[in-house]
Amino acid sequence: MTFYNHKAIEPKWQAFWADNHTFKTGTDASKPKFYALDMFPYPSGAGLHVGHPEGYTATDILSRFKRAQGYNVLHPMGWDAFGLPAEQYAMDTGNDPAEFTAENIANFKRQINALGFSYDWDREINTTDPSYYKWTQWIFTKLYEKGLAYEAEVPVNWVEELGTAIANEEVLPDGTSERGGYPVVRKPMRQWMLKITAYAERLLADLEEVDWPESIKDMQRNWIGKSTGANVTFKVKDTDKDFTVFTTRPDTLFGATYAVLAPEHALVDSITTAEQAQAVAEYKRQASLKSDLARTDLAKEKTGVWTGAYAINPVNGKEMPIWIADYVLASYGTGAIMAVPAHDERDWAFAKQFNLEIIPVLEGGNVDEAAYTEDGIHINSDFLDGLDKACAIAKMVAWLEETGVGHEKVSYRLRDWLFSRQRYWGEPIPIIHWEDGTSTAVPEQDLPLVLPVTKDIRPSGTGESPLANLTDWLEVTREDGVKGRRETNTMPQWAGSSWYYLRYIDPHNDEQLADKDLLKQWLPVDIYIGGAEHAVLHLLYARFWHKVLYDLGVVPTKEPFQKLFNQGMILGTSYRDHRGALVATDKVDKRDGSFFHMETGEELEQAPAKMSKSLKNVVNPDDVVEQYGADTLRVYEMFMGPLDASIAWSEEGLEGARKFLDRVYRLITTKEIVAENSGALDKAYHETVKAVTEQIEGMKFNTAIAQLMIFVNAANKEDELYVAYAKGFVQLLAPFAPHLGEELWQILTASGQSISYVAWPTHDDSKLVENDVEIVVQIKGKVKAKLVVAKDLSREELEKVALAHDKIQAEIAGKEVAKVIVVPNKLVNIVVK
């Protein structure tokens, strides 16, 4: 039996593509454009795993398909190479993180090339390259000039073990850091912030303009968290002080019986009575040790301390005790809430715990037993009594504005973006702080501000980055003799990934971020594929920067990514014992189709789980390419199921994909290829062209491959294969299995040219119709024969064909035919005497 040799074919075509610059981005302005973007990887020491190629194969299929359809295709790859692991490695080994990063990139690139992706490597970018981060820094200076980058003393999520502050999004629900699982404490520090809140409304509204999964849009909407309500001002009794509360339910103000301030609220110390001072100070200390997520966990026990002070409810003049509690965050809203315990579960639980008054102001429920959180007619509310929610809110807002104690307000959950990191391995922030108290951005002609090479990258110990140790780099003097100090914080890893898709468009431009005409030609990105784990942060940050650049006139579109697709996760095989505990694969024995724990002998249950080093179920693509070939890996990952589904890896599935490709190879190399078309495969071929084209467009790659299999089965039943159909089929296969596609194309054409730019096959609708039909011939209602006849044969012709059939002749010999009933395209029934 014939098999193809992937170890010979694949390197041969990879070398051909590289030598001939086959995938150089097209620049013919008369052609339509297609920009296919992958979420570029962080080049870790572990290298590529089989999850990476799933998304990469999808964009590659689309890119190859669009090239064949006559598009200019931009399909680039690069490296998101700043990041903590490289710095941690450098601290552990004393090596330069740049060396570690370069080695990892070389390994990633080798692995990616072995999989036959059609990247234009002339456009490769690396976020740690000064010629790249010059423009990351340039964008920062523009943010600074527009007042969108500012310094603030803010409580940050400080991780002692990492020596840095991390963003809220990087804190896990258990209050530890996403990276390393270390404890997170709140600590006030000078930080750079980006004013993403200034773009909240546009970030929300423009989600309507992009073709993204609704689930991802919803995650962004919830993160932005728009709510409409009112700001209400409460005076503090017996003082000239007041505080403001934002509420979405100003109509429940008559039910507000106490107020709660965040422990960090600026008023707390000045209103706390002497009797309560010690308890308040201790509570503030404890709150500072908790992350925002831990503090706002709905399930946690409510804690709080009374300040000894009272607020005055503006609608009824009642005194409301002012408490502090850690579930109120200084960074959210105004850092103060009015509590309406009758109609809010958290306020109700707090009021019950501390024996505070509960006044119902909406009809319905029993507030002695639980908070009533449904809508209802207003009661105990003076001028709002008898009104429904909408009318009551409108009337209360009008009253607040007339009396000068409040006004309508739109609020967002979105916070400004904490942009500094106290680490070495990141882009230096291009700001100089002068001894006269002013700060200035490094001028454009002095960019990039290059990260200095140093052996000493331990944290400085002062909360500043290791750059604070490098005096020569740190200290500067202005022309007028004024001394200054460079900013020591570096940018987060998100910085370089917030605009990289723009640099691919013009990666070697020294004069500007990218040429205006080229940006106009290529934007927006037509398809962006990557993991759903970046649903909020990366995509929100990139959209924010893009909108700033749009306002600056740098980019021509409001949104960067027209269509977004999240591939599913490839799960590993795992085994669980009777307790549900996972057992590493090297501790499992397979016997007669069952699985047993090698040490305990217990029978185990097999189930998919996320691939992890600890379970020893990570599959390395190098091993798959070695054994089965890159084309097999590509076809298998696309055939596993829908692209967005999470599916378990299976060795059997891999073998099935390889067998299919071997059958394709045998079909083209051993079947007689002929110049004359017998017509036998017309329908199968044209159906395949139509279906595969539509399914690639719709990213239904698994059904496209299934259709290719149907054609192979049909072709194998015939003695010969029409050359045009053989070529067309190989073209349809090539985006999925490009090495085999090229090899078979040369066998069929001997052209010496790549298949990549050969025009994509088209189908003929007239060939999709069946020309023949099968009819049954009955005698007295019993089936005696089945005939294949031309479609739409007349009744007379059908009767003639049926009566002339050998089997029927034998059945009716010596009998009189009384009647023949004909149903065209279906049956002939002969009645005999």
Swiss-Prot record:
The keyword Aminoacyl-tRNA synthetase applies. Keywords: Aminoacyl-tRNA synthetase, ATP-binding, Cytoplasm, Ligase, Nucleotide-binding, Protein biosynthesis. Its main location: cytoplasm. A motif ('HIGH' region) lies at residues 41-52. It comes from the Bacteria. One of its GO terms (biological process) is leucyl-tRNA aminoacylation. Belongs to the class-I aminoacyl-tRNA synthetase family. This is Leucine--tRNA ligase. The gene is leuS.
